[in-house]
Amino acid sequence: MSDAKELKQVLTGPIVNNNPIALQVLGVCSALAVTSKLETALVMALALTAVTAFSNLFISMIRNHIPSSVRIIVQMTIIASLVIVVDQLLQAYAYQISKQLSVFVGLIITNCIVMGRAEAYAMKTPPMMSFMDGIGNGLGYGAILLAVGFVRELFGNGSLFGVQILHKISDGGWYQPNGLLLLPPSAFFLIGMLIWIIRTYKPEQVEAKG
């Protein structure tokens, strides 16, 4: 029973209670860049989830054999190898999305969420729970990306996943898109609003004043 409870906490905790973006403020740079469309936000979320989950798994499997002095190098080597695999798969099967994501898939290597979970969790926890932790943090990251991408694409372009929902004035409709929402700074403000909303309803997440 305790294992099931811990598994549930590992999977669902990062979505709201310990969200890597909203609480820890990690991985913000990619969130600003890839959320102008829901499609790219979803693919980026899936890519980071896969890399985080499998890097956690592999690092946890060999954690007792990694010398402390080179552990960061080993972690980065595993993460970089997985990022290359994900990038090649995207180029092979989703080339247009891969072009839109540009360098941001490659920059998963330096994403604080991936490195943070590898160092703080996978190095101390058995493989299966580490794998689930990677999925949970990927879900938390993806939830913020999809929420921001939903607002930016719908109100910035009047569409969702490329399908026109709000018919634009330029096409004879009624909606005037807000082009500002398609610019990266808008994502910064939207993420800030999400953090404010979450911390309003969960005041325990507010940092203590020193």
Curated annotation (Swiss-Prot):
This is Na(+)-translocating NADH-quinone reductase subunit D. Keywords: Cell inner membrane, Cell membrane, Ion transport, Membrane, NAD, Sodium, Sodium transport, Translocase, Transmembrane, Transmembrane helix, Transport, Ubiquinone. GO terms for molecular function: oxidoreductase activity, acting on NAD(P)H, quinone or similar compound as acceptor. Pfam families: Rnf-Nqr. NQR complex catalyzes the reduction of ubiquinone-1 to ubiquinol by two successive reactions, coupled with the transport of Na(+) ions from the cytoplasm to the periplasm. NqrA to NqrE are probably involved in the second step, the conversion of ubisemiquinone to ubiquinol. It comes from Shewanella oneidensis (strain ATCC 700550 / JCM 31522 / CIP 106686 / LMG 19005 / NCIMB 14063 / MR-1). Composed of six subunits; NqrA, NqrB, NqrC, NqrD, NqrE and NqrF. Belongs to the NqrDE/RnfAE family.
